[in-house]
Amino acid sequence: MTALAHAGIAAERTREPGGSEGAEAIRRLLLEGADERWDAVSETLLFYAARREHVIRLIKPALDRGLWVVCDRFADSTIAYQGYGRGLPLEELQALHRFALGDFASDLTLILDVPAAEGLARAAKRSGSADRFERLDRAFHERLRDGFRQIAAADPRRCALIDASGDVDDVQRAVLSMVSARLGVALAP
């Protein structure tokens, strides 16, 4: 966000699930509680309820005001988590997206790629307790990584895979370089 501000680009930072009052309430339902709290379909419907609220209440109004929106996770995460991770049919998830959001999509999706074991180790080092997804087994996280990689390969115009196994500074440089190249702006750390 600092790099965008230094480049004179006004931006709104947000996250999913969450980002608006209703979506944050749904976030708590999704991330807290027992791992088996929701079946895959119920979980997906909750994610899309949160996403629709988020888009209507925050993302579209920000875009209408000429702001860039930087969102930590979006629709590709549902394809990866509930499709590749939970095994729901991808075409049904895509149909749900069209129903909830029409043709609304991100201009650029950066997929920070790290081996599953490394990602789980990093999550374990963060303060606070693990959420429902972080507690899932390594096999789930392997499917998740594979899903994100397949998403990036299927839509290389919109998606960029970034090696996130390096240190924070290296990853930041890679992100800024990719955003600069893809969106035609000069960003520096």
Regions found by a protein language model. Name each.
Residues 1-3, 117-189:
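NTP-dependent small-molecule kinase module
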Residues 44-46, 111, 132, 161:
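Short aromatic/hydrophobic contact patches that present stacked aromatics
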